[in-house]
Amino acid sequence: MQRRIMGIETEFGVTCTFHGHRRLSPDEVARYLFRRVVSWGRSSNVFLRNGARLYLDVGSHPEYATAECDNLVQLVTHDRAGEWVLEDLLVDAEQRLADEGIGGDIYLFKNNTDSAGNSYGCHENYLIVRAGEFSRISDVLLPFLVTRQLICGAGKVLQTPKAATFCLSQRAEHIWEGVSSATTRSRPIINTRDEPHADAEKYRRLHVIVGDSNMCETTTMLKVGTAALVLEMIEAGVPFRDFSLDNPIRAIREVSHDITGRRPVRLAGGRQASALDIQREYYSRAVEHLQTREPNAQIEQIVDLWGRQLDAVESQDFAKVDTEIDWVIKRKLFQRYQDRYNMELSDPKIAQLDLAYHDIKRGRGVFDLLQRKGLAARVTTDEDIAEAVDTPPQTTRARLRGEFISAAQAAGRDFTVDWVHLKLNDQAQRTVLCKDPFRAVDERVKRLIASM
């Protein structure tokens, strides 16, 4: 499958402070954030005009699920649009607090752990063909996902009783299973719950919940692009060396704690390989695969960055990727800060900086400031993101959903939508079932809109 439907779901951390002290509980902050949403959507679980879903997840975490996308830059753009949608709610909520005489600063963090040790996720979704052998996909994909933090981790300072250490991944400490049908209780790497949101006879949806939330656009593109490319190679029957891990959960932590990528991890049968070895195998197969697939500039861009990042890890000289990979950008920032102020990695100010990196408010968040200075690479523009806040992807089913929602809102009609259904809540209860996520034009939807 060279054209693939993809989407990203992001849970955001939330807090409200007043002069540095916590002002409201996360529950209360979430209520203020979603008050405007509830006023027009009558629910804290809504679909937006751009085809995305916005809702309040377990534990007071606002969650934004992008609309269906079918190319990488489109997906990165819609992922960033989610940040802007949430930032807009943040500004509105702060104004409500001020109007009520409460005061306080609301923070939304696109990260994966809070100070209490709780974890929340960034989930990737990839449409795969039902006819494929799911167990083979899992077997080949698992070693890739365990080691890919080397190329797309968000970076984190982990405080241990002995010392503070810089880790590649925020999520690695919180994953407890390899493949499972649960997402919250056990936190697997690949979630197998079969909800395709499409024609179940043709497709299933691969739900990857091991990834970090990325701030850097090129890192997000690399994370999703490499996974989609590995899936494409599996579907095409490309042979891979067997890197089945003895204990994926131990391995994911070991990889996260080793920025050299050289520490050996145990494979099934007593063999060993390093994260760098494993990633090199997938990368070299990808380079070969590019010779046989139809040319695609976005795929070529991510394979180029993949190779440069692996070279950088191997040489430990990150100068050629230090604006493109989240954990590299963050580590460089910490090192500069430590050198300037002569402080240890365990200093609370570094922990503050770690958190501030993920603050999504423009003009305040540290990552945004780095990006404005040209210290973080981009693949989108602000104009494209602004358009994606209100406009669905034009090449997928999301277009139908977005146009239906816009028309129903403009006509003042009561409606219900989900990923596959568009329904007018009138006497006739007219419903259109959109089972093909690749289909952006549908006469049935046009007629439903015209009937308003």
Curated annotation (Swiss-Prot):
PANTHER family linked: PUP DEAMIDASE/DEPUPYLASE, PUP--PROTEIN LIGASE
GO MF entries: ATP binding; ligase activity, forming carbon-nitrogen bonds; magnesium ion binding; ubiquitin-like protein transferase activity
Residues given in the record as ATP binding sites: R53, T66, W419
Note: The reaction mechanism probably proceeds via the activation of Pup by phosphorylation of its C-terminal glutamate, which is then subject to nucleophilic attack by the substrate lysine, resulting in an isopeptide bond and the release of phosphate as a good leaving group.
Species per Swiss-Prot/TrEMBL record: Mycolicibacterium paratuberculosis (strain ATCC BAA-968 / K-10) (Mycobacterium paratuberculosis)
Signal peptide location: none
Catalytic machinery residues: D57 (proton acceptor)
Transmembrane segments: none
EC number in record: 6.3.1.19
Record flagged with keyword Magnesium: yes
Pfam families listed in its UniProt record: Pup_ligase
Described purpose of this protein according to its UniProt entry: Catalyzes the covalent attachment of the prokaryotic ubiquitin-like protein modifier Pup to the proteasomal substrate proteins, thereby targeting them for proteasomal degradation. This tagging system is termed pupylation. The ligation reaction involves the side-chain carboxylate of the C-terminal glutamate of Pup and the side-chain amino group of a substrate lysine.
Keywords tagged on the record: ATP-binding, Ligase, Magnesium, Metal-binding, Nucleotide-binding, Ubl conjugation pathway
Family stated for the protein in its record: Belongs to the Pup ligase/Pup deamidase family. Pup-conjugating enzyme subfamily.
Pathway the protein takes part in: Protein degradation; proteasomal Pup-dependent pathway; Protein modification; protein pupylation
Binding-site residues, Mg(2+): E9, Y55, E63
Reaction(s) catalysed by this chain's protein: ATP + [prokaryotic ubiquitin-like protein]-L-glutamate + [protein]-L-lysine = ADP + phosphate + N(6)-([prokaryotic ubiquitin-like protein]-gamma-L-glutamyl)-[protein]-L-lysine
Any single GO BP term: proteasomal protein catabolic process
Protein name, UniProt field: Pup--protein ligase
Source organism superkingdom: Bacteria
HAMAP family named in the record: Pup_ligase (MF_02111)
